[in-house]
Amino acid sequence: MIRKAFVMQVNPDAHEEYQRRHNPIWPELEAVLKSHGAHNYAIYLDKARNLLFAMVEIESEERWNAVASTDVCQRWWKYMTDVMPANPDNSPVSSELQEVFYLP
């Protein structure tokens, strides 16, 4: 498994709405993530800084990257643009984090 972590932002007034939209996520999005090899996906909120920290275990970079081109992912990104900063393609603005420590 490949461990990935990344940071996103959430609008200051949208913390509760962001959480509501993820509990639960759309069943078809969950199915796409799982079918593309995503496991143990978690997102944490830093309320003081309006930051989201996400971590996920993936089976391959290629399969993970392919999620972005699915119809359900494109619809999800558009659905989330009013609660978080987005790129021109509606993907969330994010920064990948470098792993510096891991305790198995």
Curated annotation (Swiss-Prot):
Biological process (GO) annotations held by this record are: rhamnose catabolic process
Q: Which GO molecular function, any one, fits this protein according to its record?
A: L-rhamnose mutarotase activity
This protein's record includes keyword Isomerase: yes
Q: Which residues form the active site?
A: H22
Which EC number(s) does UniProt give? 5.1.3.32
Where does it reside? Cytoplasm
The principal localisation class reads cytoplasm
Catalytic activity, as annotated: alpha-L-rhamnose = beta-L-rhamnose
Kindly name one Pfam family recorded for this protein. Answer: rhaM
Record field: transmembrane = none
Q: Which UniProt keywords apply?
A: Carbohydrate metabolism, Cytoplasm, Isomerase, Rhamnose metabolism
From the UniProt record, list the coiled-coil ranges. none
| Top-rank EC class of the record's enzyme | isomerase
Which N-terminal residues, if any, form the signal peptide? none
Residues at which substrate binds: Y18, Y41, W76, W77
Query: What InterPro entries does the annotation carry?
Result: Dimeric_a/b-barrel, L-rhamnose_mutarotase, Rham/fucose_mutarotase
Q: What does this protein do?
A: Involved in the anomeric conversion of L-rhamnose.
What's the family? Belongs to the rhamnose mutarotase family.
PANTHER family, per this entry? Answer: L-RHAMNOSE MUTAROTASE
Name of the molecule in the record: L-rhamnose mutarotase
Gene that this sequence comes from: rhaM
